[in-house]
Each structure stands twice: as structure tokens, then as C-alpha cells.
């Protein structure tokens, strides 16, 4: 169905039950919010019924009740959206309004929205008791409650009438149409006016001119077929009696001879009825659209011309594919007009014009505007509709652009999220937020922070014996484990250079236990490193670490690829602690030891005075364990009770891991584990 139907259903539900209710309907119907009410989009009947069924289930009412409620609202919403004047000007009485329902529906579908939808058909009959019998035909069974709602609301709003509607008959049958077989539902309504103080006859008025047969029509046969170049007259057997002269330009002359059955030349596309005399009389108030069955004359003339040219050029006619292409693009002429029962009662005249609403359609039929009589409003309609089509095309383009912009905005948000995540990886969150806001980040001096460097002492021996891919895999596996620990311990990763990994505590967010955090991080890194295998010896990898506490200056360096860098003697001393550390040990300065013990409880082993390059002799220490947290708590992993010590610090002793690994069978894995 047309998107207007979905939008009007949405408006009804939101106005009556609120936005939250409509969200529930969309969720149950399986629609994405915003995709269910695109005005110029065609939705399948299944989509529309899924919305109505969802409303029915949530409200706990029948589908028929929902459709009838919608019918009442449809008139209100239609009149609100610019159709008020047209609906009120259709007829002075209810009977005339019902007679023109078919034409109104056709106009909205085919002219305004250019939708070519399978709309319903209506036929109206007066009854002697003043009631009206309304026949409703549709190819969509089950929608008849909409008619009840529409008619009652229209009678009330337009004619100030209260009407009752009773269903006196409802049948379904299979109808063979040109497009195939379909199920057609026929519902008969008895419409009765309740406030009888107003009559349908009141507004009919009286004739201004007296009927007279004293004068004969002063119009010859040739004048008539010239004035109405597309008309046809048929008898009770629906055989041709008379045709307009322009039809000969589109239909072979032998088919337009007197006595040719109308159904041999045309097929009826609207209303969906058999092409016989009685059916036409039943729908005499409807708009009739007939389509020529035969090959368009324009195509035949072009085909004959191409054949003659091919013969002259001694070409094989069957090798010319242009004919097939032209046939597929050719248009069978459609006629639209009114069927009129002539006074004799035995003939019907079809006053019509080519069903053309735009310049491109006019050209497809091989027509020009001069083919239309000057009095024919089709000329004005084509010109006006050409402008309307331009407006519709612009609206469609705007809708497409809006949808594209929405999708681009969503994609932009996704990419922005990725960029923000990457920026947060490169810079501290607080610093990254300042840069996003366009603020400059000034360098800052921190009175005390703790810096740690770690590296792989055997890295220089590993590199010559491995492929670059193996080296990258090794470092990626190792640093991924370190990054996880950084997140657990709430420290900050500054940078990695080769096999060196630099981290800091107390920067950029000030904390009192920055050295305690880094000490726990160091213990965890030594433990996690041993779960990575040396690709040469296939043994657990050993790292070393150096820690120092002191004043640090931190700031953002660079514009194109900004980096958060640390400067000062503390950074240099920390690097010296790492470079002078034995393999597998955590080497700390005296400042770091004192700072760690001020907030935490650790076991340190004095190393004595060590000659440090550029610093002279310094008192240094080895970090052995934390008394506040076990290794398993630090690395956030479960302990294997079968082979792991209670606190995990025994595993840090050099050689202990090798003893455990000898007892545990490992299957072709490049990752070592102590569990």
C-alpha cells in the first residue's frame, strides 16, 4: 500500500494512544522506527496488515474494529492535509458523493500520486424507501470496515448527517483479469439516514432550461467524429457502431469496422469488471480506462521502415535487435473517460481521451498536444502535471537525500566512535576530551609520579633468528597482555618502542598510591610475560622492569599525530633502573621503595649500591612481592589449585615455572601457561 496509508495509521495511533504505544506497535510488527511511514514508498499488503495486526493484539480488539476506527480517522486526516475543499465540493448530497467515490479514488491514485494502485470500486443505487445501496468491490478482502468508517465520518463532517450502515451481503469470487486471476470481494451496504429532516433530494435543484425536443441537433456525422476524435459507440452486444477519427492512428482500420467486438480491441483496466453491456451499466458512474490490445501503429510503421531499409542494404533482418527493443518499449494506447447510456437504452457512448498525464507519456504514444481537442482538459492536465511531477521528483530526491544523510550521520557516529576510541588509546581521556573540544593542552609539571620501563633482555638474540612476522606476533601477544593489566591497575601506558614498554602512575590523574599501582603492575607483567613463549627456545619469556618515583613534566607533542610525552630526570632514572636490572627482576630506586611503602605493603630485597650510568652510585632494591594482593588478584585470573601456589609469588622465582611446565603436557601451542 501507499506510504500515505502508513503515515495516517501512525498519526491515528500517536494522537490516540501516544508515542510509546506506537513504538510497541513497530517492535511487534518488526519495523524500524522512521522506516514505516515514508510517504512516497510502496509497502506490501503484508507490511500494512502486520501494523494493523500489531495494533489489534496490543489493544485486544479485532482487526475489523481497527480498520473501522482507521476509516473514521482517514477522512479527518485527509481533510486536514489539504483535501478539505475538494471533498466538500464533490456533491451537494450524500448520493452524489457516493457516486463520485470511484472517480475521487482514481484521481488520487493515478493523477496526484501517480501510484497505479489496485484501488476499490464503488457503485451506488437509490432505493424507493430513501435508503441507498452501496456496492463495494475490492481485490483486498477484509478491508470493508474502512468503508463504514469513512462513510459515517464523511456524512457527519460534510453533510451533517448521521447514517447507519448495515452489511446485507458479502461474497468473494475468483476473477480472471488481463494480469491474471485474483480474488475479488463484493460487499453490499445498506446506508440509511438517521436524521431524516434532511433529504438527499433537497439539493438537487430544478432545471433552468425546459426540456424540449423541438430542435434537431445541427451537427453532422463528420463534425461529431472530429469534435470527439477518440469517442466510441457500442451496441448491447458491445460491438463497434461508431468511432472517432483519431483512433485510426493507433488501431488497425480493419479492427475498427462496424460490428467488431469491443473486447477484441480493448481490455478494461479500470474498473476491474468484464467488458460487457450489463457490467458497464452497473458502473456507469465510474471512470473507465481501456487499453488497446493490438501492437501500436507507431511501432508497426517504424518496423516496416526498418524492414525496407534492411532489404535495400542487403542486411539480414533477423540480426536486427532494434525491433525487439522498440517493441518492449512501445506503449499500448490507454483511453480514459466516461461511459454514457444513450437515450435509446440500447447503446453506450464512450467519451474519452488518451490517458496521458505528462510529456514523456505523450511522446511514448507517438502523440503531440495538437492531437487533443482544444476543449479537452487533458491538454491543461498534461502541462500542470508536468510541473507537479517535477515537484514530486524533487520531493523524492529530498527524501532520498535525507535518508542518505541519516545513514551518513549514523556512519559518521560509528567512525567518530572509532576515532574517539583510538584517540583515547593514544592520549589520556581527559587530554583527548580537551583536544576534541579544540582546546590547547598546556604542559603540566607533576611533583611526584612513578615511571616504569620494561623490556625483553633476550630480544636482540631473538630478532636475528626469527622472521619479521614472528617478531610482530611475539610483541603483539606480549603487549596485549600488558595493556589488559594497565586497564586492571588503572595506570597509563605512555608508549612502546621496540620491545620496551613505558607506563606511569599518577599522571595525568593525581593519585596518592601511584607507586603502589606501578609495583602491582610490574609484578603482574613479570607473571604474564611468562605465559608467552620464546620462539627460539620455546620456553617462557622473561622480562625485566625498572621503577623510579619523582617529579615529571607531561604534555602533548605534535599536531598531526599528537603524543602524550613525559620529560624529566625521573624518566631517565627509571630507564636506567630497567637497563641495570637482571633478567626476570623488578629493579626499584630508593625513592620508589619509600613511595610504595607509604601506601602499600611490599617485600623488597636490597641490592646495595649500584653504579648507575649518568647517576653514580645509588641504593637500589628488587621488588619481590605484595603483602596486600596475591599475584592472581593482580592479574585477575583464577588459580589452578592443582599446580599453583596460594599467592602466586613462588611462580615468580626463576626456574619454578620450568619445573611446573615439565609436569604439564602442552599441545602445539605458542602460548605458555603456568596453569
Curated annotation (Swiss-Prot):
CDD domains: CHD. Its EC number is 4.6.1.2. Heme binds at residue 105. GO terms for molecular function: GTP binding; guanylate cyclase activity; heme binding; metal ion binding; oxygen sensor activity. There are two types of guanylate cyclases: soluble forms and membrane-associated receptor forms. Residues 450-578 form the Guanylate cyclase domain. Binds 1 or 2 heme groups per heterodimer. Mg(2+) binds at residues 455, 499. This is Soluble guanylate cyclase gcy-36. Expressed in URX, AQR and PQR neurons. Belongs to the adenylyl cyclase class-4/guanylyl cyclase family. Regulated by molecular oxygen, which binds to the heme binding site. Probably not activated by nitric oxide (NO). Plays a central role in social feeding behavior by synthesizing 3',5'-cyclic guanosine monophosphate (cGMP) from GTP. Oxygen, which probably binds to its heme-binding sites, may regulate social behavior by modulating its activity. cGMP is a common second messenger in sensory transduction and is implicated in oxygen sensation. Indeed, C.elegans exhibits a strong behavioral preference for 5-12% oxygen, avoiding higher and lower oxygen levels; a higher level of oxygen inducing a naturally polymorphic social feeding behavior. One of its GO terms (biological process) is feeding behavior. Heterodimer; heterodimerizes with gcy-35, and possibly with other soluble guanylate cyclases. Its cofactor is heme. Residues 384-427 form a coiled coil. InterPro entries: A/G_cyclase, A/G_cyclase_CS, H-NOX_domain_sf, Heme_NO-bd, HNOB_dom_associated, HNOB_dom_associated_sf, NO_sig/Golgi_transp_ligand-bd, Nucleotide_cyclase. It holds the Pfam family Guanylate_cyc. It is found in: Cytoplasm. It catalyses: GTP = 3',5'-cyclic GMP + diphosphate. Transmembrane segments: none annotated. The keyword Metal-binding applies.
